[in-house]
Structures are given as structure tokens and as C-alpha cells.
């Protein structure tokens, strides 16, 4: 469970001044590969200190609190883990706090407790439940971090995306990323990147002109 942070440290430490590292707490890796909740006050504190140690940092730029589940946001109390993060922020161990897999109502409730700088939810050109939520966060100046840029596509939607990609000489992933980039100015993307070539392909998505795939919004 600590491998990713250790690899980041090996590759990038000492970190450049303009690098922002975002971590996530609220779940732990089970021995069976599952991700059960880990949201008690003590679990949150331990997770933050684990991140600090494995990354070789004295303070974490942003810590996202993971709520909900793989099926989406869940209406459940989260004051205990959020309050723990606020305490750690007051201690100078965290600079900013974000939320993951949450509803607009949960974000509003959290904002009554502390500042929220980002929201990480499932969103892409085919999964548009958060359309109004994205616009609300844009108006508030809160970053929106969509995950699974190709998740949840029907066969018809996948076929249409592939057609658009072929017409542009691009991959389906590049078109999906480009659509997100141009959807709203508060988008921060986290596409999976498994190799240097994969990274280059993802970066090429920024070259696509939005006029080429505007009809995908329909």
C-alpha cells in the first residue's frame, strides 16, 4: 500500500518547488485486494503520518478524504474523519483538504466545517451525472478531479468515441481527455499512465481542438 508514495519519493525527491502532491486517505488496502473504509480519527491520523513518512515530507500539500464507494457517493456521516484532517491542518501537517466520491450536499456540509479545494468524482463524456455539480464548483473556484475518463461507456458510446478518435487521428483516450480538459477551467485530470509512451500519448490530448468533438456533449 505504500509502494506508490515510495516510488514518487525515489523518482522526484528532492521535490521541485512548483510540484503539488495530492494524497488520499479514508480507505486501506485489504489482504484480499479490497479497499475497506479506514475513517476513524486514529486511522486518518495514521494515514497522514504514513504519507508524510513515505513521501519524505514535513507537510502534505493536499489530502483528499475518500467517502462513498465504487458505486458512487453514499449518504453517510463523515464529521469524524473530516475533523481529524482539520486538526492535522491546524497542526501544520496539511495545507489543504479535498473530498472524493461525494455529492453536492456533502460538499456543502463539509464547506461549513472547513475550506475544500478539490472534489474527485467519477465523470467523463459518457457519465455526466455531475454536470451541474462541475459548474457549481467552477463558480466557487474549487478544482474538479474526474476519474475513469473511459469508464462506464455503453457499446454505442464507445463506438461513437472511436469514430471521432479515428477521424482526428487520435486515440479514444486522447479524445476523452481532451473533452474533459475543455469541459471546464477547473478540471484537473488524473489519467492512468503506465509508461513513458503512455504519458506522451496523454499529453498529446491537449493538442486536440474542442471544435472537433463538440457534438460529443449532446
Task: Label the model's feature ranges.
Residues 40-53:
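Short, acidic/polar
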Residues 214-218:
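Conserved small/polar residues in nucleotide/adenosyl-binding loops
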Residues 1-7, 70-72:
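Glycine-rich, proline-tolerant flexible connector loops at the mouths of alpha/beta enzymes
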Residues 18-30:
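A short, structured active-site edge motif that brings together acidic residues
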Residues 10-16, 53-56, 111, 135-139:
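Acidic (Asp/Glu)-rich catalytic clusters
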Residues 31-42:
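Active-site mouth loops of central-metabolism enzymes
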Residues 55-71:
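Active-site groove signature of glycoside hydrolases
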Residues 68-212:
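Beta/alpha (TIM)-barrel catalytic core signal, keyed to glycine-rich beta->alpha loops juxtaposed to Asp/Glu
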Amino acid at each position: 500500500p505504500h509502494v506508490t508514495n515510495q516510488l514518487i519519493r525515489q523518482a522526484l525527491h528532492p521535490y521541485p518547488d512548483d510540484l503539488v502532491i495530492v494524497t488520499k486517505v479514508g480507505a486501506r488496502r485489504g489482504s484480499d485486494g479490497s479497499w475497506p473504509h479506514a475513517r476513524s480519527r486514529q486511522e486518518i491520523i495514521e494515514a497522514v503520518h504514513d504519507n508524510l513518512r513515505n513521501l519524505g515530507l514535513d507537510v502534505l500539500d493536499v489530502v483528499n478524504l475518500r467517502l462513498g464507494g465504487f458505486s458512487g457517493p453514499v449518504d453517510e456521516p463523515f464529521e469524524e474523519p473530516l475533523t481529524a484532517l482539520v486538526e492535522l491542518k491546524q497542526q501544520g501537517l496539511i495545507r489543504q483538504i479535498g473530498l472524493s466520491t461525494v455529492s453536492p450536499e456533502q460538499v456543502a456540509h463539509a464547506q461549513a466545517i472547513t475550506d475544500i479545494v478539490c472534489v474527485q468524482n467519477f465523470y467523463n463524456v459518457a457519465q455526466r451525472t455531475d454536470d451541474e455539480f462541475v459548474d457549481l464548483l467552477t463558480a466557487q473556484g474549487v478544482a474538479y478531479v474526474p476519474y475513469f475518463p473511459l469508464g462506464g461507456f455503453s457499446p454505442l458510446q464507445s463506438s461513437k468515441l472511436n469514430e471521432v478518435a479515428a477521424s482526428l487521428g487520435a486515440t479514444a483516450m486522447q479524445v476523452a481527455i481532451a473533452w474533459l480538459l475543455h469541459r471546464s477551467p477547473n478540471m484537473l485530470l488524473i489519467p492512468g499512465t503506465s509508461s513513458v509512451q503512455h504519458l506522451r500519448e496523454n499529453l498529446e490530448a491537449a493538442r486536440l481542438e474542442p471544435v472537433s468533438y463538440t457534438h460529443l456533449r449532446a
